[in-house]
Amino acid sequence: MKTRHNFNKDLRMDLACSDYFRPVFSYIHFKDGCAYACDTHILVKNKLSECSTFTEEEIEKLDGKFIGSKAYKSILSYDMVQVTDMGFECILYDNQKVIYPFSEVYKYPEMENVISEHLKESTEGITKLRIDPSFFSKIEKALFNFEYAYMQLSEGNKSLLVKSKDSDSIGIIMLKSI
């Protein structure tokens, strides 16, 4: 049986950060043991100790680093990946290595502030919601443990929170006005 040392193979965080018109939203940001991905319509936060097999030391090396969504998608295809100071070192079957270096991003939104603002539960009644159905497909693939998730409206009905009961993963879908 093959051993995998990488992100969960089915965790497609790259789908939650592919904004062609806003390049800053085409990166996955690693901070405080979590991975954040956002395209301004959806946001996901996954705890690295839950959604990967990286060691605590490797998770610490990721702190404050960024990787492009296309590089992340490529990294998922490898079974053996090590986190180094330079980036992700992917080991091929013949012991050759491919390195995906960390990206430099100079101005990235503080996603934890966005999350805490949207964590307040809704106190208003709501009669209509408008959600792009493709957001559900993206967040299902980008959020760890989605099958155990539930949804709730945020205060002011600005967003739909997607929380997993069995992990610290959280997703946010920004709602549209009707």
Predicted regions and their residues:
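DNA polymerase processivity clamps
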Residues: 1-178
